[in-house]
Amino acid sequence: MPNNQSFAVVGAGIIGAAVARELTLRFPGSAVTVFEKEAEPAAHQTGHNSGVVHAGLYYEPGGLKARLCRRGVTLLQEFCTNHELPYEECGKIVVALDEVEERRLQDIYARATANGVPGVRLLDQAGIREIEPNAVGRAALHSPHTAIVDYAKVTRALVDEVTAAGGAVRMGTEVLRVTNTASGATVHTRAGGQAFDLVVVCSGLQSDRLAKASDAADEPSIVPFFGQYFVLEAAYRQHVKGLIYPVPDPKYPFLGVHLTKRIDGEMMVGPNAFLSFSREIYRGLGINPKDSLEVAANPGFWKFAARNLPTAVREIQSVVSKGRFLREAQKYVPSLADADATRATRGIRAQAMTRDGALVDDFVIQHQGRVTHIRNAPSPGATSSLAIAEHIVEAAIQEHSLTSAPPAG
């Protein structure tokens, strides 16, 4: 039926594309416009991640990550099935190497159980070998339904749905700011302003900058961290059947160097995690003066750095030495001792940080009038993307009493 409402989404990563699609589903016949500064969708975080569909093991029960990850898995699997996109439940083990890590593993198991993750179980050494014959460890947690996809392909399929529903996708169009008006919001580009009833900003690595330019909250700020990946040489691909992860260090918000099967059959080692001197440079030295100076001027970063110096020293060793990097993986799969690997394109993660140097763990979604800003959506952001879209659109419907079609499913 005809619908005279208009909506805009800023950013064509997987979350932006999912929000745009959700708007076309809930408001059929409305005008939905996606603004993306790059020439193609999925140009940044979406197109540079590991492709893992997380089951929801690690997240604080009751938080947005926990709730939206589980719903997101269901929606993503359905979407891939309906669009004939590859989706493989290869499973994952999280391996403890010592007694301290084994105690942490018990905590992860408790969280996974509380979050309703299906099929998770604890393994002894014999159990590890049943799942991954070449892996070693003191104990492990097995998540059989952890999966892999190609998130860039998923994003393109979402964008195709938006255009098929009559939406407009304006690639190569950078949004400078978004302002609230008496009856809606205006998206400002170099070509001028365009009015909409509702705007959702999903700008990832640029989320803090666009929020501040739009007079939204100053916090959280974004500090970019890069993750380096290596592609294991083909002769060793079969040494690992699925995904092998270390037990994460609770003092550091990243999951550590792990072995990840890709949907194309390649086996990845990585990523590590270290401060990035740019937000969007993926090769070479990766230094952007503006981005680097912004981090240096961020008082929260220095507080974070002071608290995490030992971990940073360990991580920089894996950054500068491929051998050191691969040795981390060999702790879990000793048969990789003679394996070589080639450097792949790095990924850059938008990590939200508070003024006191705390890394923001959960998703952060801020509402300002008729504008919604996604301020933090790290892993499992891609896994949760379709559920995040549902959550945001439903919140807008309730907040602004918008007339919509009922939610799917």
Describe the residue ranges of each PLM region:
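Glycine-rich FAD pyrophosphate-binding loop
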Residues: 24-47
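Helical element adjacent to the flavin cofactor pocket in flavoenzyme catalytic cores
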Residues: 141-198, 384-397
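Flavin-dependent oxidoreductases
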Residues: 18, 178-288
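Flavin-binding catalytic cores
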Residues: 114, 120, 217-219, 236-237, ...
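Short beta-strand to alpha-helix junction loop
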Residues: 60-71, 95-104, 141-160, 170, ...
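Beta1/beta-strand and adjacent pyrophosphate-binding region of the FAD-binding site
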Residues: 2-15, 33
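Dinucleotide-binding Rossmann-like beta1-alpha1 core, especially the glycine-rich loop
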Residues: 51-127, 137, 256-257, 266-268, ...
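C-terminal catalytic lobe of FAD-dependent flavoproteins
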Residues: 304-407
